[in-house]
Amino acid sequence: MMVSLFSQFDSPWLLNIPLVLLALIMPWKLFVSFGPSWAGTRSSRLVYATMETLMSQVMQPLNKLGFRWVVLFSSLMLMLMTLNVIGLFPYTFTPTTQLSMNLGLAVPLWLGTVVYGFRNHPVIALAHLCPEGAPNLLVPVLVVVETLSILMRPLALGLRLTANLTAGHLLMHLISSAVLGLMELSVMLSGITLLLLVFLTMLEIAVALIQGYVFAILVTLYLDENL
């Protein structure tokens, strides 16, 4: 039976029970709970140092008012990085390849920043729709263009994450299939392809981490416009 190339992105089912909730919950079981005995270990210091470095870059565009969002952004970035990396393991499901989940994250976060801006600084928020110094004849057109640009932000945010992860998974699937197919023709050629697959896997791990960082920092930039 031929299996579709995109079947790896289907939500898994077992006995007619959807396992997508299990795929979302299980990664958190991999984290060691914080406690006095864990606070001074090397792994904890590595986690603290890494998160401190990343969050200092993510929160850099914001002023003091934006630092109340640091817990949300750090949790978001850590969750996306974890789900992206775990999805690279065999026989696992990657929730972040589903556009529905990514839009479920992008739309509320984007909408929260927009509502915050219009609620606290309505004049400044409306001023973003028309660049300063624009000709009067172009003002209606620019307002429409800027409005569409703002409305497209959550879609672009979700599509960027989905497309990057989906493309990487498909490429790894194709190359791994080529490795198995070439074993019957040439062991050396199959070994070279396997080496390429190893390098691609390392690249995909980096992409998985970077995409979580990019998602968080773009939401930060959206918030910065409305503070």
UniProtKB/Swiss-Prot annotation:
GO terms for biological process: proton motive force-driven ATP synthesis. GO terms for molecular function: proton transmembrane transporter activity. PROSITE patterns: ATPASE_A. Pfam families: ATP-synt_A (PF00119). It is a multi-pass membrane protein. Keywords: ATP synthesis, CF(0), Hydrogen ion transport, Ion transport, Membrane, Mitochondrion, Mitochondrion inner membrane, Transmembrane, Transmembrane helix, Transport. The keyword Membrane applies. It is found in: Mitochondrion inner membrane. Mitochondrial membrane ATP synthase (F(1)F(0) ATP synthase or Complex V) produces ATP from ADP in the presence of a proton gradient across the membrane which is generated by electron transport complexes of the respiratory chain. F-type ATPases consist of two structural domains, F(1) - containing the extramembraneous catalytic core and F(0) - containing the membrane proton channel, linked together by a central stalk and a peripheral stalk. During catalysis, ATP synthesis in the catalytic domain of F(1) is coupled via a rotary mechanism of the central stalk subunits to proton translocation. This is ATP synthase subunit a. The gene is ATP6.
